[in-house]
Amino acid sequence: MPELPFSQEQFLTDVSRIYKKNGKVIVAVSEGAQYADGRFVADSGVRDAFGHAQLGGVATTLANLAKEKIGCKVRGIEFSLLQRCAAHCASLTDVNEAYMAGEAAVLNAVDGKTDYCVGFERTNGGDYHCGVKLIKLDDVANTEKKLPREWINREGNFVTQEYLDYALPLIQGESRPPMENGLPRFAKLAKIKA
């Protein structure tokens, strides 16, 4: 969990324990994982426009560490672009909310509202529902919203039931993107020069 300092010792203990028990282990790790001193586990030294570290390579770094220290067979997989190329795997909730955000953005832009981004706000109640809200860009640009500590287990290596209750509604439903000849069909927009 990137919200807490990463410990190589704890990582190796966890991986070793699960590997011995099951003969295999899958680790999901954030590119933002950092040591207690603030160094990223995999820092390339490259910075973005805001001066933040451009992250990447943590899977390979930790796979190599596990291979060296535990001696297990490893494979580091970085989702990077893959996750951006897999819209067909998006949940129906995610797809519906993307349409809500797009519609709200267009309607507000046509209405003359600029320098905002569209955000979501859950409504109270038993079933999951959310609405859209406009947020000033200055309030979100160059900021981050971290996972609350109460959503991370005591060991700092997994989430709590409270987090699962929050996240589960977000992955509900299967989207069925339109397909054509075995490939996703995308809108074809006319090229109109303004």
What is the predicted role of each segment?
Residues 1-75:
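Accessory alpha-helical/coil subdomains and C-terminal extensions
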Residues 43-194:
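C-terminal non-catalytic interaction/assembly regions of soluble proteins
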